[in-house]
C-alpha cells in the first residue's frame, strides 16, 4: 500500500505469542514497539496466538481487542505437539498478506517461513532475528529444520533484517553474505521497591538471595547454576524465577536436581509487583546462558541497579561491559568461583550496583529503537516523541 510522507503507517506485527505479555523477550519487544508506534500516530495491529499462557492457564490474562492504541487480533492456533508457533504465524501471515498494511514485521526466525506471502502482495516486510533459534536445545529435528527454513526465507525475501547482537550480524554475513541492521533492544529506567510480597510468599529479604529470572529452557545454563551453587559456601538463597516454555520435562529435571536443598526456591512465572520486588532486592543477578539473542532480563536486572554475573558469550558480555562480571560459558567451576567471590565481597557488588543502572539506561533506549525501526519501515520525517534524556535516567537512581 503506497503512503505519503506525512501519512501514518499501517503496520502488522506477528511471530510473538501474545501482546501484552511477559511470556518471553519477543513479547516484551513487540509490546514496547507497537505501543510506542501507536503513540506516534501509526496504526498498529498485533496478531496474537489463541490458547493459554505457556507457563499455564493460571497466568492467562483478559482477552483484549485493543491495548494502548494497538489493535489486537487473535489467529487460529494448534496447541498440540509444539505446533503453536508455526500454525499461528501461518494464519497471521495470511491475514497480514490480505490486510491493508504498509509494513509487516515478522519476529523470530520460525515465523519468517511465511514472509514470502505478504511480500508477494506488495507489503514491505521486516524481520527481526531475536536469536538463532534453530540452535536451541528444546527443538526436535523437524522444528529445527522449519526454523532454519524461516531463517533462509528472511534472507531471501525480507526488505530489511534486524539483528540484536553483532555476533548474529556476523553470522548472517558469513553464512549468507546478507547485510543486516544492528538494532539492540532497549530498556526503561526502573524504580526500586521494597520487599513485601516476596517476604510474605517466599521468605525473601533484601540482599539475601541470588536471582535468576528467565524461561526454564536448557540453553539458559540452569544446570550449571544449580550445580555451582551447591558448592558455594553462603547463607544466601538461590531464587529461580520463571516458567517453562514447552519444556515441562526440563523443569522437572531442574527441580529434581535441587531436591533436598532448602535454599533453592522455584517461584514459577512472575510478573507485576512480584517481578519488581525480585529485581529490586536481589544481592546479585545471574544469567549463565549458552545461547542468547539479546537478553532483556539482563537489561532489566541492570536497570534496577543489580550487580550481574553472566556467561562470557558476546550477547551477554557486550551488554554488561565493565559494569558486571562474567564466567567461562559452561564451566561449573568458574561459575562457582565467581559466585563465591561475589558472596564474600559485598563492597564489590555495591560498587557495580552504583554504576549499572545509569550505564544500561543510557546505552539502551526504547525511543531510539522505535525511531530506527520506523526508518527501516520507510517512514519519513521521524521525530523522536520522547527524546533520550540521560540526565533524567541519572536522577532516577540517585540515592538508590
Could you describe each region identified by the protein language model?
Residues 307-310:
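Short hydrophobic beta-strand element within catalytic cores of glycosyltransferases
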Residues 28, 208, 212, 217-231:
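A conserved mid-protein helix/loop that constitutes part of the nucleotide-sugar donor-binding site
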Residues 325-333, 341-347:
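Conserved acidic donor-binding segment of nucleotide-sugar-dependent glycosyltransferases
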Residues 94-97, 120, 144-161:
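Membrane-proximal helix-turn-helix segments that form the acceptor-binding/catalytic region
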Residues 269-270, 277-282:
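Short alpha-helical donor nucleotide-sugar binding micro-motif in glycosyltransferases
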Residues 50-52, 187, 213, 237-252, ...:
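Glycosyltransferase donor-sugar binding loop
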Residues 251-273:
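Nucleotide-activated donor-binding/catalytic signature segment of Leloir-type glycosyltransferases, i.e.
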Residues 290:
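Aromatic "clamp/platform" in nucleotide-sugar-dependent glycosyltransferases that forms part
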